[in-house]
Amino acid sequence: MDKRIAIVGAGWAGCAAAVEGVSAGCHVTLFEASHISGGRARKTFVEGMAVDNGQHILLGAYRQTLRLMRQVGIDTRQAFLNLPLQMRYPPFPAVMDFVTPRWPAPFHLVAGLLKAKGLNREDRLALARFFACCRAIRWDIGEDRPVIRLLEQFRQTPKLYALLWRPLCLAALNTSPEQASASVFLAVLRDSLGRKRTDSDMLVPVTDLSALFPEKALAYCIARKGVVRLGETVRHIAFDEKGWVID
């Protein structure tokens, strides 16, 4: 395939697009204003120490992400700590301890809910109502709205919001419930909680986020004659008789 493709931004989406492009035989040029790839999920340096720029987890349902990681040479079995779905807090004071067993879906969720510590009857009923309603509507709410509105609609308790929904939304979407898309959030829940048990497994990175995928993705592209331009800002995109021009 003799196509020239320019990709603006070397976040995870840009890196994924570049990998797919060079794999299809395209001539790919990837532009990134920063000197480090990864976008909102990358390493940064604080006082000379490399740290992640945010807390991120993956879920077992992220099949295409995991496929791309393996494609660029990452051993996904070694790159993550694989945990069953859980939300655990320090036992003192006893706030909440929710852990699902490695049982077939949806029994793992039922068992986790029944055994959860720190949840009262109102919390359990609210959580059960949420999942029952989502399954009934096939995880489709129609017109989109912020996640916070969805939680209010399904009458989730303040404790569930603070200890379950808000942390889960931030971890999965890197966006607060006040701003995150409820449709996207439900799609994540559908893919992770509405299917196989392994889809809900929490994959906690054991390396920095840049090494987890972006750096390997860039090396993969360069090895296939792709061009990576870090530290270059695209300021102008125009179309003329010869095609698209990027400056």
Protein language model features and the residues they cover:
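Helical element adjacent to the flavin cofactor pocket in flavoenzyme catalytic cores
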Residues: L186-W244
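Glycine-rich active-site loop/strand segments that organize a redox cofactor
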Residues: S37, A41-G60, F130-R135
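N-terminal Rossmann-like FAD-binding beta1-loop-alpha1 element of flavoenzymes
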Residues: K3-L30
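N-terminal Rossmann-like dinucleotide/flavin-binding domain of flavoprotein oxidoreductases
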Residues: I57-G73, A211-G226
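Mobile amphipathic helical/loop "lid" adjacent to a hydrophobic cofactor/ligand pocket
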Residues: T65-L66, R70, D75-A182, L186
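Glycine-rich FAD pyrophosphate-binding loop
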Residues: V22-V46
